[in-house]
Amino acid sequence: MAKNTLIQKILENHIVSGSRTPGEAVSIRIDQTLTQDATGTMAYLELEAMNIDRVKTELSVSYVDHNMMQNGPENRNDHLYLQSVAAAKGVIFSRPGNGICHQVHLERFGVPGKTLLGSDSHTPTNGGIGMMAIGAGGLDVALAMAGQPFRIAYPRIIGVKLTGKLSPWVAAKDIILKMLSILSTKGNVGCMVEYFGPGVAELTVPQRATITNMGAELGVTCSVFPSDERTKEFLEKQGRGESFTALAADADAEYDRVIEIDLGSLEPLAACPSSPDNIKSIKELSGIEVGQVIIGSCTNSSFRDLSIVGAMLKGRKIADNVTLSIAPGSRQVLEMLARNGVLADIISAGARILESGCGPCIGQGQSPANDTVTLRTFNRNFPGRTGTKGDQAYLVSPEVAAAAALTGKITPPSELPFDCPEVAEAEKFLIDDSMMITPPCCGKSVEIIRKKTIGAPPLNSALPDKIDGIALIKTPDKTSTDDIMPAGVHLKHRSNIPEYAKVVFERFNEDGKPTFAQRAVAVRDAGKHGVIIGRDSYGQGSSREHAAICPMYLGVKVLIAISIERIHAANLVNFGIVPFTFADPADYDKIAEGDSIVIENLREKLEKGEYPVEVKAVSADGKVTSIKVNAKLTAEDVKIILAGGRLNCK
């Protein structure tokens, strides 16, 4: 009798090649792709370099949701390029203001049982509708658009059994925060999460999408919910009932690990500064003064989320010490709220309404004041991500955020002088796809608009046989791709690598000393190689491949870390940087910044798979320390690295 999980069923329908053994490489067919503008420009430049006339996927969509501020020509230049290249290559273009890629894709394009690859780490949002939705670097997405399969490690599958029903004031956000308290943000590479059990039927598709969205913070490849009557209801309300397929695991499915959560036992939670897995109950945090509240983002801006906020705010005013901003996830939701009067209630309470886009979640506006607590319904609170150094960002549910806006402090919603509002689900969603531009049947005659701020992807040189390098930096645990390549004010340079590379590791620069970029360029121009030394969970967070491209441009050839997160490790390979891990984690302490790093016969060792590889670290006083490193690379990975990156492979 079959004992397949839902994840195994979807994989089986998409596997092109590889072993079904957990941890071993497997290639899968990709049905749909999505890109957003911050990573999309590079992805489409890479697609152009492949000389593909038209995308080979069932559906590809290019969204503009990140670089919305027109503070200079760069962002609009990107948008013109993206719109024209989408028309040329057969891609649907979602115009600025239409909404955040993950929410809009869930609303208008998500199909149960299909695979989705996106150039954004929160692509797993669409697992809420029963898709296998995976975040990746832009080059991997470009390859998928070109018809190439996507390689992953065959997963270990964590089953999460949901029972019971959420209590008043407890939200879907609290479910995923509970998961983060159990699994943390590290140690889950190579895993996928599958939700099952009677509690699943108690959750709507948008609630499920909140949970799968923040599965990215767990570090898992993706999270998947069954496709059931709730899914059918959602699709029918979106006018897409024909996309429904019932999907579920076999009754006796076997998981590598099972976690059970009684929804009725949960209470409102928060992720405290400055990591999504620093979880405490709202009761523990009660009374902390709050200066800013922002509600929205791709995690928590569904019609239901913002409707309950509107109901809580109706007839009331926000506290004098608080600013409240609303960042709707899609134009669909924003217009529905405007039509039914909820938006007026929110505005009347004192809220500011932002454009439907990523905005403050990526440091694009609404940075908090110094020494100010900010409550956000977002998915990440990495240090400085708000745009304010030393920020104090808490991640909470819309209910908790609205309670704080009213009281001026962190407040358990159950202590408010009114009951939890009963908010009805929308009977039908507003359908208006006029902000989507469908490509012509043949795009060969379309002129691709390429302004001067958009440059071609830089190419790496082949990997040398000997690494004669310098340890340019040592980074702490959980160094994120935000730490490597900051967004915020620098985001507009994503299409201009020479300019963007100037801010690599900007957050670690010290006043009065050469920046990381300056030191890396000096090493590169002296004919040596840059080496980065990292601790645990290096490269967590965003899928931005610029965290590999820009260090590569600066001459970095090798990373040695205690552990490396999945998407970033793949991006390093794609751009010819060797992703090594310490054989003994204690050896991290044996290397100092500025040490010479020597690796002999590297090409031969990688080709033969001779691990561990010996690395010699030579200190300033001439002391030589020998350490051992490993790399989990497939034969294809080695081929790519030896060539200096995938774009060099023929």
Features from the language model and the residues they span:
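Fe-S-dependent hydro-lyases/dehydratases of central metabolism
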Residues: M1-K650
